[in-house]
């Protein structure tokens, strides 16, 4: 286990958000933090780069420190075999019923967690927060002396029960369980320990801050994207759950009506996702020689600022995930006043108000129809984008997230 000491949001101050959230909201957060001054708090997850959890922590940890909490962040380490096992957990918990949990998988999963527990004494902190299934068994290997919280960032609405029953024996030892939405809460857990808390974006991070028109245009030019032609974009990891093939199918049908349309597939290759590389290659094969589809990743120099530029340059954002714990890429696009066409699953349903801040769709044909409509009705797209930003501002930005954490810690 190692500690993350460099943060994307280094030097973040609550005061920086006054203009965005207003005086009253800011002072309320300060008041809630008063009781927690000098308390120590530790986050533990499985990667410091790639995916929504790491991105949130890069900004949330510095903000927690700014309000007086001694917040730290540790990342568990493991072999490729371990991360293959945890990827199976992820897929099974999100609904893959064909996967089987073997004794070897259980053994490796517990061994690596035990090894990580030997690296650092988590009982030295006043509060411990464990993110997702990868490090969930850590609680087994300590004599718990303080509140332990487990946070689930994935869509648990229809899990493979073999995996869930095995995981549950660790989860139920925690003092609180955080889920993004009610529909992810498992009935066999103690309901009194359940906390519903959606994640958030940071409006001042490089991914979401305002960019000049000239920077956006330069970024498009650097990656050979034509700003004069319509742009459809999906930002997502290369993962079967993200519906990337469906996005390509939507684009191809839209292109029959609007031949000049371009598609940007923007994604991060994350360190804890060995399966992602296989799916990435499959995606390239499906695309073939269509040069109006750009595959843009951290491997080709795409980082937070570039993603920001691509989202701001897009006419329509797609999110065709088959399962989606929350969908922070939807949140990001809505913050940038973009209409999102998203499959009506998981956290996407929580964010998009159908017909007002974007469109919720059930399948590829529905997505084709709504994407064409938005490309052909710019005024509607613009109005939806404005509504979308308001919705995010009220519900899903990092200061609201921080406040919800303060409420939780104050409840112990």
From Swiss-Prot:
Q: What class of enzyme is it?
A: transferase
Q: Does the keyword Ubl conjugation apply?
A: no
Q: Give the cofactors, semicolon-separated.
A: Mg(2+)
Query: What start and end residues bound the annotated signal peptide?
Result: none
Supply the InterPro entries for this chain. Answer: Glyco_trans_1, Trehalose_Metab_GTase, Trehalose_synthase_GT, TreT_GT1
Q: Which domain of life is it from?
A: Archaea
Q: List the disulfide bonds.
A: none
Gene3D superfamilies according to UniProt:
Glycogen Phosphorylase B
Q: What are the EC numbers?
A: 2.4.1.245
Record's keyword terms, sorted: Carbohydrate metabolism, Glucose metabolism, Glycosyltransferase, Magnesium, Transferase
The keyword Glycosyltransferase belongs to this UniProt entry's keyword annotation: yes
What are its GO biological-process terms? Answer: glucose metabolic process
Temperature notes read: Optimum temperature is 90 degrees Celsius. 65% of activity remains at 100 degrees Celsius.
**Which conditions up-regulate this protein?**
By maltose, less efficiently by trehalose, and even less efficiently by sucrose.
| Catalyzed chemical reaction(s) | an NDP-alpha-D-glucose + D-glucose = alpha,alpha-trehalose + a ribonucleoside 5'-diphosphate + H(+)
Q: Which GO terms describe its molecular function?
A: trehalose synthase activity
- How is activity influenced by pH? Optimum pH is 6.5. Only 13% of activity is retained at pH 7.5.
Q: What does this protein do?
A: Synthesizes trehalose from ADP-glucose and glucose. Has a much lower activity toward UDP-glucose and GDP-glucose. The reaction is reversible, the equilibrium strongly favors trehalose synthesis.
Family membership, please give it.
Belongs to the glycosyltransferase group 1 family. Glycosyltransferase 4 subfamily.
Oligomer status and interactors: Homodimer.
Q: What is this protein called?
A: Trehalose synthase
């Amino acid at each position: 286990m190692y500690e993350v000491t460099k943060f994307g949001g280094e030097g973040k101050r609550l005061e920086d958000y006054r203009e965005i959230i207003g005086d009253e909201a800011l002072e309320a957060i300060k008041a809630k933090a008063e009781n927690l001054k000098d308390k120590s708090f530790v986050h533990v997850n499985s990667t410091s780069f790639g995916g929504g959890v790491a991105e949130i922590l890069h900004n949330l940890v510095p903000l927690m420190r700014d309000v007086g909490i001694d917040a730290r962040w540790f990342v568990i380490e493991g072999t490729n075999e371990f991360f293959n096992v945890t990827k199976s957990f992820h897929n099974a918990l999100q609904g893959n019923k064909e996967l089987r949990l073997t004794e070897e998988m259980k053994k490796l999963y517990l061994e690596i967690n035990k090894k990580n527990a030997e690296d650092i004494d988590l009982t030295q902190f006043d509060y411990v927060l464990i993110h997702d299934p990868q490090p969930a068994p850590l609680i087994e290997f300590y004599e718990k002396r303080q509140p332990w919280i487990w946070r689930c960032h994935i869509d648990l609405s229809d899990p493979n029960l073999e995996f869930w029953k095995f995981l549950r024996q660790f989860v139920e030892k925690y003092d609180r369980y955080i889920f993004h939405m009610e529909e992810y809460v498992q009935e066999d857990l103690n309901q009194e320990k359940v906390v519903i808390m959606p994640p958030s974006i940071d409006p001042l991070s490089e991914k979401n801050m305002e960019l000049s028109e000239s920077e956006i245009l330069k970024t498009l030019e650097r990656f050979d994207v034509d700003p004069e032609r319509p742009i459809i974009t999906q930002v997502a990891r290369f993962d079967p759950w993200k519906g990337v093939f469906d996005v390509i199918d939507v684009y191809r049908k839209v292109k029959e009506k609007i031949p000049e349309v371009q598609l940007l597939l923007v994604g991060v290759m994350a360190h804890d996702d060995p399966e992602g590389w296989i799916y990435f290659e499959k995606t390239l094969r499906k695309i073939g020689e269509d040069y109006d589809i750009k595959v843009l990743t951290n491997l080709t120099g795409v980082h937070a600022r570039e993603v920001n530029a691509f989202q701001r340059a897009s006419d329509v954002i797609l999110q065709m995930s088959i399962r989606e714990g929350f969908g922070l890429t939807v949140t990001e696009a809505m913050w940038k006043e973009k209409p999102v066409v998203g499959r009506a699953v998981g956290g996407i349903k929580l964010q998009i108000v159908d017909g007002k801040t974007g469109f919720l769709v059930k399948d590829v044909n529905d997505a084709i129809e709504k994407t064409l409509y938005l490309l052909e009705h710019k005024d509607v797209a613009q109005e939806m984008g404005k509504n979308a930003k308001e919705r995010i501002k009220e519900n899903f930005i990092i200061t609201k997230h921080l406040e919800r954490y303060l409420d939780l810690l104050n409840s112990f």
